[in-house]
Amino acid sequence: MSTIKKLYIKTWGCQMNEYDSSKMADLLESTHGYQLTDVAEDADILLLNTCSIREKAQEKVFHQLGRWKNFKDNKPDIIIGVGGCVASQEGEYIRQRAQCVDIIFGPQTLHRLPEMINQVKGTKSPVVDISFPEIEKFDRLPEPRAEGPSAFVSIMEGCNKYCSFCVVPYTRGEEVSRPCDDILFEIAQLAAQGVREVNLLGQNVNAYRGETFDGQICSFAELLRLVAAIDGIDRIRFTTSHPIEFTDDIIAVYEDTPELVSFLHLPVQSGSDRILTLMKRNHTALEYKSIIRKLRKARPDILISSDFIIGFPGETQDDFEKTMKLIADVNFDMSFSFIYSARPGTPAADLPDDVSEEEKKQRLYLLQQRINQQAMNYSRAMLNSVQRILVEGPSRKNVMELSGRTENNRVVNFEGTPDMIGKFVDVEIVDVYANSLRGKVVRTEDQMDLRIHESPESVIARTRKEDELGVGVYQP
């Protein structure tokens, strides 16, 4: 009698890593029958998908591997793998320092995991593959599997911008776009499984230039319109973008494509032109604000979020005040803001880290307080309004209630019935909290005038006619 083989994946970092981890799980289930478990001690394979953005990323990895080594001491056949950006950076060093590790793979080689596992089982020797094969991994992954009404789809990998503080070009490689038709086919498959909202992923999605079936190049703006035309997809989100390639043709999509949500994450990092130059961002604060003005002209109700790095080398009080002014001018809704810490191998790591930790913490506190206040103002403005939300499932606050997300990315908790999950409902916002809203259902999807979704099979069945010889003829 065969026992079920179990897989445990621990994921740190961005949505791209979350997406990669889900693909690893699907891949190893299809090739080896591994079933995901939430209990590391029960697993036959332990995979750590790492992120190198935060300070002391390496030590965090080795600390986790130290715990997993104890499992391997008790169960020698366990296979331990390390992937992600720290694996790309540290490769052989991980093997030297943590000899319990069997497999080391990068973000672009996760599709080779089945072969690596077989090799480790056969030879009992470790495998390291942190190469950058162009986009090959998407050709080797199993068909997508929906896990709710919202799904992530990777459209490109890597980044060519080489900001002075960032490790992404070194850990994920330079920009490579997936073929347009592959993306559209994956999204159509997800839509057929009930996905209503798709989030397009990439380190710099607005640099997307994917090849079409006839050898032409599809821009990001064109891709957005093509995705919006897929039957069943009612909402489109994307992350992350770089200001220097947020072009007018992308902004124009906000004017004529209602499926594209009124929420945008557009990182600026600093409001000081001097610091932006040191960061090698290749744009000014004024140019950033110009993009926002155009966006708000195209979509007046759009909300903007951003990334900010606090205490970058050389940042003065005047530089910080310029960042605070930009925050007020743009009126950001939310931010991902962090104290600067040098990433090994980046140009900024050679700059003197001359802002004290105390000053960094104080500036971060002031920045986050300002943005939290602005976010609360936006939330209060939604009080008593009716918002359309996509119901994602039970609420985290109360499993007897449901939770969904507004178009502008607000979480709403409300009383509802299980049949609402995966559908849209209109709710009146009746209360406002720091990180969520409370709503009351006023309209279900059945009462909305939404476009009718039909599968290709249903269209054929409805339009099929046979001639006198019994040959099927289809007349849409």
Swiss-Prot record:
What family is reported?
Answer: Belongs to the methylthiotransferase family. MiaB subfamily.
Report the NCBIfam families cross-referenced here: miaB-methiolase (TIGR01574), MiaB/RimO family radical SAM methylthiotransferase (TIGR00089)
The name under which this protein is listed is tRNA-2-methylthio-N(6)-dimethylallyladenosine synthase
Cellular location(s): Cytoplasm
Q: Where is the TRAM domain?
A: 380-443
Q: Where is [4Fe-4S] cluster 2 annotated to bind?
A: 159, 163, 166
Q: Where does [4Fe-4S] cluster 1 bind?
A: 14, 51, 85
Q: CDD domains annotated for this entry?
A: Radical_SAM
Enzyme Commission number(s) of this protein: 2.8.4.3
Classification from the root reads: Bacteria, Pseudomonadati, Pseudomonadota, Gammaproteobacteria, Enterobacterales
Tell me the superkingdom of the source. Answer: Bacteria
**GO CC terms, sorted:** cytosol
Q: Which UniProt keywords apply?
A: 4Fe-4S, Cytoplasm, Iron, Iron-sulfur, Metal-binding, S-adenosyl-L-methionine, Transferase, tRNA processing
Q: Which PANTHER family match?
A: CDK5 REGULATORY SUBUNIT-ASSOCIATED PROTEIN 1, MITOCHONDRIAL TRNA METHYLTHIOTRANSFERASE CDK5RAP1
Where this protein primarily resides, as one coarse class? cytoplasm
What broad class of enzyme is this? Answer: transferase
Q: What does this protein do?
A: Catalyzes the methylthiolation of N6-(dimethylallyl)adenosine (i(6)A), leading to the formation of 2-methylthio-N6-(dimethylallyl)adenosine (ms(2)i(6)A) at position 37 in tRNAs that read codons beginning with uridine.
Cited SUPFAM superfamilies: Radical SAM enzymes
One MF annotation (Gene Ontology) recorded for this entry: 4 iron, 4 sulfur cluster binding
**InterPro entries according to UniProt:** Elp3/MiaA/NifB-like_rSAM, Methylthiotransferase, Methylthiotransferase_CS, Methylthiotransferase_N, Methylthiotransferase_N_sf, MiaB_methiolase, rSAM, rSAM_horseshoe
Q: Domain Radical SAM core spans what residues?
A: 145-377
Needed cofactors, names only, are: [4Fe-4S] cluster
Its source organism is Proteus mirabilis (strain HI4320)
Task: List, for all copies, the residue spans of the domain called MTTase N-terminal.
Answer: 5-122
Quaternary structure note: Monomer.
Cofactor note, please?
Answer: Binds 2 [4Fe-4S] clusters. One cluster is coordinated with 3 cysteines and an exchangeable S-adenosyl-L-methionine.
Which catalysed reactions does the entry list for this protein? N(6)-dimethylallyladenosine(37) in tRNA + (sulfur carrier)-SH + AH2 + 2 S-adenosyl-L-methionine = 2-methylsulfanyl-N(6)-dimethylallyladenosine(37) in tRNA + (sulfur carrier)-H + 5'-deoxyadenosine + L-methionine + A + S-adenosyl-L-homocysteine + 2 H(+)
